[in-house]
Amino acid sequence: MEKAKVFFTDFRTKANGDGLPTKLKKLILKAGIADLNLDGKFVAIKLHFGEMGNISYLRPNYARAVVEFVKAHGGKPFLTDCNTMYPGSRKNALEHLYCAWENGFTPMTVGCPILIGDGLKGTDDVDVPVVGGEYVKAAKIGRAVMDA
């Protein structure tokens, strides 16, 4: 298996310097995502919306930077994550959306719709083969993600 390329940026912002959303767009270009044909295609942007009451998630304006990039390249973006199998604020699509909104992820703040990828109860998924998987032979992927 080929090693993945990992791109880094300095999280510090200096006076009159680029902020993180601008740096994120530069990373997207460096990674070659602009070379993909996104024109007219649904683009699932997978991220973690955070649990209710915590701060361990990316800020919504970072998601918006990716959304703007996808739109500028003709794509139809939506933010997505799948429900959890454990109890909490993301165990079904309704509570998951309320959690996302509470943490600042709304269509107005991120610039695109938010879809929970595996449906209302987390049962709308597709089995996808894991090619070359030594221990795992298939993965369940949310249908909305697969449809994109």
Q: Which functions belong to the PLM regions below?
A:
Residues 1-148:
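N-terminal and secondary-structure boundary signal
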